[in-house]
């Protein structure tokens, strides 16, 4: 009676599960082909009953144990590895292959394994046991492994092998080590570029930092930052380079300390700036190293294209001192212009008028003047540095006659006072010297002294001397034909009280043996 009741219940459960469950096309690939011969017969059913714990199965049927309700999901796909082609719940899931050695947890089905006949178990595994039965049973009871052994339940969250190895499903979990390995390579930076130590001295690097600051002064910490930013070598260099920077700031005269108002005695508020008197020297030093090895400097820089900017740029507070003194340059030029104007040089900025006159006078050479001359006749003539003196009157009129009485004492000191003006004269004026042989050639070419009067309106006017004076050589009545002009020899002065000039300057006559006399006018 008991066996017939159990058999009727099992047959009804198998038929209901067969009608209610519809396999998807994907599930048909995993199901083995089922033929008419595989359907259970009476003998197979009886043999299966002998391997089942009948009291336990009856208790499950009476208690309406719901193992496959849709609200309860299985803890893990690997937990049902011991079942063969068994569906849990109403929703279709991929079928599981039967494993001979798998052990199902006790808490899942609540059954203890009992050894059964392998042939009958394989026959029963051909049917899907999922789906909801009309009698209330949701799933077919667990089929057991053929060997009788003590169960070892697995934890709910564990699995025997990765699901991807069982199903090959695209949504299954995959090992995470390839992604972690790739992430490690992605996060790892490439090998940093090696920057050599710059060939610039520490003083040049400090000067670059100060020159490229907004105010021209920086604290020590910002100087460090500038060097590390533009020369990456200092990012990984030992800390000794910071001591070298501080020593250069303290000992090098190119840098000076700037005390801020808010700093007081605190060292943190101390700023460093360039010494404006030595800023040009520092720039020259930078350009020298740039010309020496430009490639090495570029290799040591983070941005080599900024080198020219770092060397040449200056803030407003680091402008050259010469730019502040530029108004002095026109004053110097004006003073030089005045000196040259007093030395018979026509300046284009001045109005075109005669500045002074060059007078070639026939002054007699008396024997009584020779004792009064301060230079002996046999002394050589100072042809290289002739005495010059500026004329107070710039009119081209006839010049006063030189007096024979005395020679002023300051006349001999003119040479030392006017050396600078002589050096500043235009060389074309100094080439005006006419040597004796040239004078003779001009005389032979019918060049008379009367033609010199044509220069009267020019800045260099020439007035021929008075007829009352005796010629230079011998007792001849003619005007001196032999004149050697070696420079501008004229010195005149007028009385301060406006009286007609008297005893201004006496002419000096220098004679050299074997050469023609030189007239100093």
Curated annotation (Swiss-Prot):
Q: What happens when the gene is disrupted?
A: Animals display early postnatal lethality, while survivors exhibit noticeable body size reduction starting at P8. At P8 and P20, retinas are reduced in thickness with the inner nuclear layer, inner plexiform layer and ganglion cell layer much thinner than in wild type and lack horizontal cells as well as amacrine cells. In lungs, mutants show dilated alveoli with thin walls.
Is Nucleus found in the keyword set?
yes
GO MF term set: chromatin binding; cis-regulatory region sequence-specific DNA binding; DNA-binding transcription factor activity, RNA polymerase II-specific
Q: Which residues bind DNA?
A: 197-293
Q: Where is this region: Disordered?
A: 371-406
InterPro entries (UniProt xref): Fork_head_dom, FOXN1_4, TF_fork_head_CS_2, WH-like_DNA-bd_sf, WH_DNA-bd_sf
A GO CC term assigned to this protein in UniProt: nucleus
**Gene3D superfamilies reported in the protein's UniProt record:** Winged helix-like DNA-binding domain superfamily/Winged helix DNA-binding domain
Q: What residue stretch is flagged as signal peptide?
A: none
* Superkingdom classification of source: Eukaryota
Give the record's keywords alphabetically: Developmental protein, DNA-binding, Neurogenesis, Nucleus, Transcription, Transcription regulation
State where the protein is found: Nucleus
Looking up PROSITE patterns in the UniProt record yields: FORK_HEAD_2, FORK_HEAD_3
Expression sites by tissue = Mainly expressed in proliferator progenitor cells in brain and retina rather than differentiated cells. In contrast, is expressed only in postmitotic epithelial cells rather than in proliferative progenitors in the proximal airway.
> What's a BP term from Gene Ontology annotated to this protein?
ventral spinal cord interneuron differentiation
Task of the protein: Transcription factor essential for neural and some non-neural tissues development, such as retina and lung respectively. Binds to an 11-bp consensus sequence containing the invariant tetranucleotide 5'-ACGC-3'. During development of the central nervous system, is required to specify the amacrine and horizontal cell fates from multipotent retinal progenitors while suppressing the alternative photoreceptor cell fates through activating DLL4-NOTCH signaling.
**Could you tell me what this protein is called?**
Forkhead box protein N4
Naturally occurring in which organism (per UniProt): Mus musculus
